[in-house]
Curated annotation (Swiss-Prot):
GO terms for molecular function: phosphate:acyl-[acyl carrier protein] acyltransferase activity. It is found in: Cytoplasm. Its EC number is 2.3.1.274. Pfam families: FA_synthesis. It is an enzyme of class 2 (transferase). GO terms for cellular component: cytoplasm. Belongs to the PlsX family. Homodimer. Probably interacts with PlsY. Pathway: Lipid metabolism; phospholipid metabolism. Its main location: cytoplasm. NCBIfam families: plsX. It comes from Haemophilus ducreyi (strain 35000HP / ATCC 700724). This is Phosphate acyltransferase. The keyword DNA repair does not apply.
């Protein structure tokens, strides 16, 4: 791996430096060519940084700011008050060329607003989309977008999302021809809003895409499609439903509380089934797929779950590294240019 630098909003997320610093330490231990520019409050962060190995500390540059994005105020107000905040400084570091990517667990709306404000958009993209990997029961994953950047999306935006998702899946999932689907309330041709119908008819006639039609939300984890396209409203609801169910099942197996469940587990076949089911559920553990990306920008901006723990935040950092290594913005830009030349 070539040398690369990530800008990190240390204060972002529910737990701030207590999660972000141990997570970046894991990344530094795994990637000897990696370094960080950190933005946050030195009062909270420096004691934790001093506990890291000396070699790791040498690959960290810390920029103090006591300002953070207030998650309790409206997005527009937070954007106006964002100057000097740890989140905004991290994004500005990417724009200035001090880092190749930004990772933050802060307010999603503010992060998207700042990214669209400061980071140059790709030519041919009207609005960026929030994309993430959705785990499947077979251990594979699908790319899903938009997950909340655009509450509404007309057919033109949906088609742009499809283009970006297709290129993203080719690189990240190493697929020559990803299966592409539109999220809908049914698989019948007549189902869905007008925008979905319009996008559907265009995609059906695209010989260069492996478009398979509509997919319903109950099939999201069946790995029937490699790229799932929708507006941000539907995508955000679907994603949280999937993650919530997976997390609750994992919690049930980690901490059985009902006496009949404990008695059942005490039998040999109960323990055998427990371990088999638990291993299967680990395939869809949301922590392993933490990190959503704003596709459609000239730089990599990754949003971690605010509630992420150390391991989950570590996965978000790795997600950013993987995109830099795969030159995702460059590949999306090249793919869009090639598409427009062929139209």
């Amino acid at each position: 791996m070539n040398r690369l630098t990530l800008a990190l909003d240390v204060m972002g997320g529910d737990f701030g430096p207590r999660v972000t610093i141990p997570a970046l330490s894991l990344a530094l231990a795994q990637q000897p060519m990696l370094s960080f520019v950190l933005f946050g409050d030195q009062y909270h962060a420096i004691p934790l940084l001093h506990s890291l190995p000396a070699e790791q500390q040498q690959r960290i540059r810390f920029v103090h700011t006591s300002r953070i994005v207030d998650p309790h105020v409206p997005v527009r107000q937070a954007l106006r008050q964002s100057k000097g905040s740890s989140m905004r400084l991290a994004i500005e570091a990417v724009v200035a060329g001090e880092a190749q990517a930004c990772v933050s667990g802060g307010n999603t709306g503010v992060l998207m607003g700042l990214a669209k404000w400061f980071v140059e958009p790709l030519v041919g993209i009207d609005r960026p989309a929030l994309a993430s990997l959705i785990p499947a029961l077979n251990g594979q994953a699908s790319v899903m977008l938009d997950l909340g950047a655009n509450v509404e999306a007309d057919s033109k935006l949906l088609l742009q999302f499809a283009e970006m998702g297709n290129i993203f899946a080719q690189s990240i999932l190493s697929l020559a021809q990803p299966r592409l689907a539109l999220l809908n309330i049914g698989t019948e041709e007549v189902k869905g809003r007008y925008a979905i119908q319009q996008a559907h008819h265009v995609l059906k006639n695209r010989a260069d895409l492996h478009y398979i039609g509509f997919i319903e939300s109950d099939k999201l984890m069946n790995h029937l499609a490699d790229v799932i396209v929708c507006d941000g409203f539907c995508g955000n609801i679907a994603l949280k439903a999937v993650e919530g169910v997976a997390s609750h099942f994992l919690a049930l197996f980690k901490q059985p509380k009902r006496s009949f469940f404990v008695d059942w587990l005490s039998s040999w076949w109960g323990r055998l089934l427990y371990h088999r089911v638990y291993r299967a559920l680990q395939r869809v553990n949301p922590e392993r797929h933490n990190g959503a990306t704003l596709l459609g920008l000239s730089s990599v901006v990754v949003k971690s779950h605010g509630s992420a723990g150390v391991n989950a935040y570590f996965y978000a950092i790795n997600h950013a590294i993987e995109q830099i290594q795969n030159r995702i913005p460059v590949k999306i830009s090249a793919g869009l240019q090639k598409l427009h030349q062929n139209l």
